[in-house]
Amino acid sequence: MSNITIIINTPKTKSAGITIMVNQFETVSSAKEKYYKEAGSRINNQWLYDGAVLKDGDNFNNIGIEDKDIIEAHPSSKGGH
């Protein structure tokens, strides 16, 4: 069971982004909860529904930071960012 790194890019705040680790089979709802704790912001998920299983390449739109900010899921095994 591999982990997925979700990177929240925040160009508006000139941040390198916020990274949270989630299990490959975690749900969108669970990932949102982790993000709330890390960033205190809100994820408005336009492509997946709560309860959907996360997979490599899933994209989220982070309305809480800026409309066009993108959250990308990558396998953590690739390393780096």
Kindly give the residue locations of the regions a language model identified.
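Ubiquitin system architectures
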Residues: 1-81
